[in-house]
Amino acid sequence: AAPADAEKILKTFAKDKVLYPFGYGLSYTDFTYSNCSYQMNGELLILSVDIKNTGKFSGKEIVQAYVMPPAGALEKPAIELKGYKKTKELAPGECEHIEIRFPLKNLASFDETGATGHTAAWVLEKGSYELFLGKSIRELFPCGSYQSNETVVTEQLQLRFDGSTYQI
């Protein structure tokens, strides 16, 4: 296998080899996540959750938003980080409502070759986009599914060079 293929296989099948996932950090307290949900406001996705400090010490939590896109014509990561937000310092027993907002177009993938019928375009493929919030990629809580009923071009670009004439 080529090095790129080996790396893909390692990331897919050796998840336990990652010692410190993104968002890992030392905390002297614990947090619980509840009421995880999402809503649409025009073309804006809003993921929300209540964070409660259930530990004995004050602390802050960084909430991360992830999206799992549908399988489609374009190759995509299995899950992608789309945003994050830090709570204020929460005293033991204190709760904070957190919202992470991002445009729907941020779910789009780039179609370089025209696999979706749209060459050089950012495309939101038809299907179900699973939405999650959590403290790391290993601790995620489902917020719902955004359903795209059709494939949509969010931005059409123009190619500036022909690959056959590209020179180094």
Predicted features and spans:
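Short, electropositive, low-hydrophobicity segments enriched in small/polar residues
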Residues: G59, H97, R138
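Sparse recognition of residues in long alpha-helices and their boundaries
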Residues: Q64-A65, S109, S145
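Beta-strand elements of well-folded, non-transmembrane domains
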Residues: N53-G55, P69-A71, L104-N106, K135-I137
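Secreted, periplasmic, or luminal enzymes acting at the cell surface/secretory milieu
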Residues: A1-K60, Y66, P92, A121-G134, ...
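Beta-sandwich strand segments
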Residues: I137-S145
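Intrinsically disordered, low-complexity Pro/Gly/Ser/Thr-rich segments with frequent PxxP/GP/PP motifs
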Residues: A73-G117
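Short acidic, flexible loop segments centered on an aromatic residue
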Residues: K56-A73, I79-L81
